Amino acid sequence: MVEVVFMQAKRLAVFILVLLLVQIVHAKLSDIFPTPQTLILGTESFPLESFSLMWKVDADLKDKFQFSIIESEDAVRKISVTIGETVELSHYGNEAYLIEVTDEGGRIVAISERALYYALITFKQLIKDAVELPEVTIIDAPDYQIRGVIEGFYHDPWSHAARVDMVRFLGESKMNTYVYAPKDDPYHREKWREPYPDEKLAQLKELVQAAKASYVDFVFAISPGLSIEFSSESDWQKLLAKTDAMIEIGITHFALLLDDIDPNLRSARDRAKYGNDYALAQVDLCNRYQDYLAAKIPGHRLIVVPTEYYQEGTSPYRRTYNTKLSPDIIVYSTGYGIVAQTITPKEAREIYEIWGHDIVYWDNYPVNDYNRTKLFMAPIAGRGPTLPGTLGFTFNPMNEAELSKLPLLTCADYTWNSASYVPEHSWERAVAILGGEHQDTYRRFAEHNLVFFPDGPQQEYPTLTKLAQEFLTAHKAYAEARKSSADAPIDDELKDDTLAKLKALQDEFRALEGLRGEFEEYFPLAAKEAAPYLKRLENWGKVGAYYTDTLLKILEAGPLSSSTVTPEMLSTYSTALETYLKGLALNRFDVLSSSQIGSSTVVLPILDSLGRVFASNFTAETIVASTNMPVWQNYVPANAVDSDTGTFFWSSRGQRPGDFFMVDLGSVQTLSGISLLMGNSNLDYFHKCIVEISADGTLWEAVATLEGTPDHIIQFSEPKTARYLKVTGLVEKEYWIIIRQFEPIYTEKKTAFGYDRTMVDVFNKIAVDPLFVIESEITVSLEVPVPIETAGIIQDPSLPTTWTLSYSLDGETFIEGAVLDSLVQVLPLPPDPIKAL
C-alpha cells in the first residue's frame, strides 16, 4: 500500500511555496507508474540542473543506463547510483530499490541490476518535463515475484515485431515475465517433437535477446499433451532435444503445458506402467523434466499447467499432484473457472491448499479468443491484495497486441502494488500513458470497448449512456410539462434544458463519427488492429448524428399537432424526416447488417429511445417498453410492443425473481384485457409471473398470476383504466426471457393529429424497428383527410425495387403518383388533403 508522508516545513516564511510544492509533488506522484509502495514527500524542491548522477556500478552497466539529462559537471548536488544492500530494503526481495533526494544530493540504491532498471524508470518519471526535483524518498518493490503475460490464446498469433515490442513494453511497465505459448504455433504444440526451422529459431533468439535487454524472463512453454507417450524413451529424448535447442539460444525458464487435452492415457504401455492413472503419468513426466532442467540451469523451477486447471475443490487427480509433484515445481491455475470472475484471498488460499504448491495464475484477462467481436479494454478487477500462496500472475492478452497494452498496464499496476490498486484510477493513468497528448482520442475509443468479463459488469459506452439518459430524462420532463402546464416560463426552461442536453449528446455522436480518422492519425498501429471497431463506432456516430440533428429540428420547431401546424413547421418536419430516414437507412443496412463487431446492446436501445422521442412528436402517445433485464444483442424491448409477433425482446441471462418488463402507453387508456405472448418454440419465458396495471406507475393492481405456458390472453371481466402494464417474474430459472408481444387490448383507443391506430403502428414500426419490411404493398389510412407534404421510403440495397407511391383523397380511389427508385427518397405530395397512401 502506498504510504505518503509529509515532512514538517523547515521555514514558516516559505508556507506558500510549500503549498505549491505539495501540488507539484502530487502531480509527480501521479506520473509514477506502477504505484510505488512508499513515497515520503518533503517540503522543498531544488533546480534539476543542480543535480548529476554518480555511477558506482560497472562501466558497462553505466553505459547501458546512462542518463544524459542530468550529467552536468557543474552540478552541486550528487545522486549516487549503486547496486547493493541497504537497511531500508532489508525486508524486500531482489527487485527492491530506494530513491532519495535531499538538499545535499541523494542516492539511488537497488538490490539487483533489474531493480536498478526499475529505479531508473521511476526516476525518469519523476524528472519528466520537470525543472525542479522535490525532496522525496521512495522505497519500492513488487508484491508478486512473477508479473507478466502468457501468449496463450487461440487463433491468430502475434507477429514477431509485435512480440519484440511487447517484451520492451513489459520491461518499461515493470513486468518481468513473458511466457511463449501461442496455441497456433505448431512447433510449440502439435509438432512439439520437431525442431524449429532456422528462420523461426532465429526469430525466437532475437526475441529472447530483446526480453533480456528489458529485464524480462522469457519462459518457453512446450505443450506435448496432445500426442506424447509418457512411457516412450523416444518421446522423452525428443522433449530434451527441443529443450536443449531452446537453452542454446539463451532460454533459461521453461513451462510444461498439459491443458486442453484428452486426460485418458492413449497407449497400452502407458496404461500398463501407470495403471491407467493419467495424473501419475503427468507427475512422473513433470518431475523428470524438473530434475533435468535443474541440472542444466541451477535453481530452475518448472511451471506446470495441469489438465484440471480451473475446477473447484479437490479430486483424485489433484491429490496426486499435491502429494507426488516435486515441491520445486510451480503450478499454473486460472482460478475458479477458465475466465475467473474473482480471485479473492479465500479462493487463493483454497487453491494453494488443493495443489500444495506455489501458484502462478494464468489469468484469462484480457484475452478475447473466445469472443472475437469484443475488445476487453477495461482495467483488471476482482483480484484481491497480496494473495496467499501466490507467486504471481501472467495475463493472457488479446489477439490484438497493441490494444492489449491498456488493460495490461492496469495488470502491471495491480501486481506491483495490489493493496493500493484502484481499477478506475489505474485505467485513467494507463490511458494518459498510452494516449499522451492525444489521450482524449485514445480514451474515447477505449471507453467504448469497456468490457470486464462475459458474465461480469458491463460498462460499455459510459459517456454516451450518461448523455443519452440525461437527455431522455430532460425530454420526459419537458414533454410531461408540455401536456399538463401552460406555464410558458417553466416550459421554456425545460425546453432549453432539453435542447442543451440533446446538443451535448449530438457532440458525442459527432465525436464518434470523426474518431476513426483521428485514431488512425495518432495511433496507426492500434488503428490497424481496431479497424472494424472504429468503423462500427463511426457508423454509430453517423446514425446518432442523423437522429440528434432530426430531434434538434423538431424540438426547436415545437410540437406538431392539428391545432399548431403551419406550412413552415411542416417544412421543418419534412427536412427532419429526411434526415431521420438517412440515419435509419444507415442503421438498418450498414450497422445492423455488418459484422457484429463491438456491442449493440447499449447503442441500439439508445437509438431506439431517440426514435421514440422522434415518433412522440408526431403522435400524442407512443408505447414505450422498458425492463431491468440485460438485453441480448439488438432484441430490444421495443420489439415486444410493435404489433409484430415475429419480432421479440430477448434477455441475455436466466430469469430471476424481480425481473420485470413494463410498458408505458403514454396516457391513461381504457382496456378490456392484455396480450402477453412469450417464448419462441423454446423454454425462454417467465415460468411463473404476475401481471399488474397502474394509472400512475406507483399504485399497482394485480390482474393475473400466470405459469406453465408462454402465451396468455388476459380478459378483464369489466373495462379497466391504466397507463402502465408490468409483468414480473417470481421464480429463478436458467432460461432467458423472450417476449413477442406485451400489449393492451383497447376498449377505446385515444388518437391525436388525425392518425388512427394503423398509422401509429406502421409509423412506430418504421421509426423503431429497422428490420420492418414491406413485402409487396402497404396501405396507410388516416382517420380524416389531412395535408401531407412529403412521404419517405428506405430500401434494402441488396434488394432494390422500384415502387409506385399512390395516394387517395377519399380512401377508395387511388391515384398513381411518383416513382420511388432510390435507396433513400423523400417525395412531395399534392396539396390536397389525403386520406390514404
Question: Which residues make up each language-model segment?
Answer:
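N-terminal signal peptide c-region/cleavage motif recognized by signal peptidases
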Residues: 22-24
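Substrate-binding cleft of carbohydrate-active enzyme catalytic domains
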Residues: 149, 156-300
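Disordered, acidic Ser/Thr/Pro-rich linker "stalks" and the adjacent N-terminal cap
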Residues: 573-581, 588-595, 599-671, 677-686, ...
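Acidic, contiguous N-terminal accessory segments
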Residues: 26-103, 111, 129-138
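Trp- and acidic/polar-enriched beta-sheet ligand-binding modules for extracellular glycan
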Residues: 683-743, 798-837
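C-terminal functional modules
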Residues: 422-618
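Bacterial N-terminal signal peptides that target proteins for export
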Residues: 5-13
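Catalytic-core regions of glycoside hydrolase
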Residues: 112, 153, 190, 194, ...
